[in-house]
Curated annotation (Swiss-Prot):
Family: Belongs to the expansin family. Expansin A subfamily.
Ranges for domain Expansin-like EG45: 46-161
InterPro entries: Expan_Lol_pI, Expansin, Expansin/allergen_DPBB_dom, Expansin_CBD, Expansin_CBD_sf, RlpA-like_DPBB, RlpA-like_sf
Record protein name field: Expansin-A31
Keywords for this protein: Cell wall, Cell wall biogenesis/degradation, Membrane, Secreted, Signal
Annotated function: May cause loosening and extension of plant cell walls by disrupting non-covalent bonding between cellulose microfibrils and matrix glucans. No enzymatic activity has been found. May be required for rapid internodal elongation in deepwater rice during submergence.
Main location: secreted
Entry-linked SMART domains: DPBB_1
UniProt-annotated location(s): Secreted, Cell wall; Membrane
Membrane topology: Peripheral membrane protein
Amino acid sequence: MDMAMSSRLALCLAVVAACAAGGAVADWSPATATFYGGSDGSGTMGGACGYGNLYDQGYGVDNAALSQALFNDGASCGQCYLIVCDTSRAPQWCKAGTAVTVTATNLCPPNWALPSDGGGWCNPPRPHFDMSQPAWEQIGVYQAGIVPVLYQRVRCWRQGGVRFTVAGLNYFELVLITNVAGSGSVASAWIKGTNTGWIQMSRNWGANWQSLAGLAGQALSFAVTTTGGQYLQFQDVAPAWWQFGQTFSTYQQFDY
């Protein structure tokens, strides 16, 4: 069996194994992948989605910064992607038969000083994943630096329920929505106080949603629609004595 045929066979096996593991049904798309954040992934904490400490939020080190073409101004925050290294294009740099699922937690910004095929990997319209090093090394050989990949969105699995962190000041509420399963990302969100109806929030940045309702002293409820189209209400999540900076966990979770 020649090298080309071996590479194609390895890729087929990796894709089959990945689909079986991730329950994926969508088509595969080509992209490229690099890594950042150090061997322990600590440099990936924070990021343009606003998740902060990814260990505390339940996302861990299997995460990635998305190129501008994939990030969608923060609407992709929390989405999960199944990624395999394309052995048909770089057999010497791929770990055959492997796959990894990563969560979108950051933006890989464009680098206009470099060409898209010569260092400006995240320049539009390129689909690119700048993965945590531990995640990337599950599919690629360290010395490569960059590898061709195939990817698709898959369902996110999370432990526990959806969480809401309420920041802000006075009449301004900034709500970070985390630990979202199913499609992983939020399409729209609402907030409600004890004495109000549902008030639609707008995306401030990343996974942070804002309201100018001034709801201090009222118990807070939330409603969320995921990008998969599932709508859930989370009643009386925060008691009337809530304080800015607190995080509130729920027992509800999304399926899609």
